[in-house]
Amino acid sequence: MNGTEGPNFYVPMSNATGVVRSPFEYPQYYLAEPWAFSILAAYMFFLIITGFPINFLTLYVTIEHKKLRTPLNYILLNLAVADLFMVFGGFTTTMYTSMHGYFVFGETGCNLEGYFATLGGEISLWSLVVLAIERWVVVCKPISNFRFGENHAIMGLTLTWVMANACAMPPLFGWSRYIPEGLQCSCGIDYYTLKPEVNNESFVIYMFLVHFTIPLTIISFCYGRLVCAVKEAAAQQQESETTQRAEREVTRMVVIMVISFLVCWIPYASVAWYIFTHQGSTFGPIFMTVPSFFAKSSSIYNPMIYICMNKQFRNCMITTLFCGKNPFEGEEEGSTTKTEASAVSSVSPA
């Protein structure tokens, strides 16, 4: 084995020289220079000071403006809640441990940090699944006269939390485990060992199949059908120009969210799967650290996309920030008229 396995950790470095120590007890400066840990801490600080205000603002603006409380926006707000879980439950912990060079909070802290990070990522993924299904149903209309309402949104929210916890909670109760990864300052699922005592192999396969492959398959199917439907509608002019434009804008926003999610998480998932399927292979701590910390950036892109591409929300956010006034109102009125994204979910067949 090219790493060192302990009772509750796996350090990607051979202990032939005897320098490897538990990441719960000693600084891991033999894995990288201290400045590398400082960079990680600074990066996490950046994610905290950007991720918290932008996600909190998304929630606050929606609560402040009643017209934003639409079924589709429930799902988008769910993404903001998931991101806040990651910020408070994961990023603050990782920043502090990176400053010390090892996971100072012990096994319990590792479990909590791993749980919140996994929960946030899975809520985001399953929220995108619900959004993809909503887009497919609204645009492709497999069910005539269907309108995505509040009850459907609540069912979608329930699905995201049930499925996310079905992935994040088992390691807390003995099916797999959370251990420090990369530079040993953040925690995640144990992809590094088979660990038969906790049936680790079966959990990793379950997670990749049920909580990664299946969601991506559903998303791919929905958007494959959606692209065809949009082209057909444009060719046949079955909908009014305003309706088609609104549907295209919401669809474009959700597609960009999906692409951004894949850009952030595919590298991490690919590296994790490689490590799992190549047990004992040689890899350095940076090999897992970079994609792991890059995936954490997903906490800031969803609200950014939402703010940039949803004119109605953007206007409400500006009026909130400027105490009820919109200094850019003249520019907004002079721009091309766009139908608000949040209203599209209630578009009925023509």
UniProtKB/Swiss-Prot annotation:
Summary of the function given for this chain in its UniProt record: Visual pigments are the light-absorbing molecules that mediate vision. They consist of an apoprotein, opsin, covalently linked to cis-retinal.
Pfam families linked: 7tm_1, Rhodopsin_N
Post-translational modification summary for this protein: Phosphorylated on some or all of the serine and threonine residues present in the C-terminal region.
Keyword Disulfide bond found: yes
GO cellular component, one term: membrane
Tissues in which the protein is found: Rod shaped photoreceptor cells which mediates vision in dim light.
Annotated transmembrane regions: 37-61, 74-98, 114-133, 153-176, 203-230, 253-276, 285-309
Species this chain originates from: Conger conger
Name used for this protein in its record: Blue-sensitive opsin
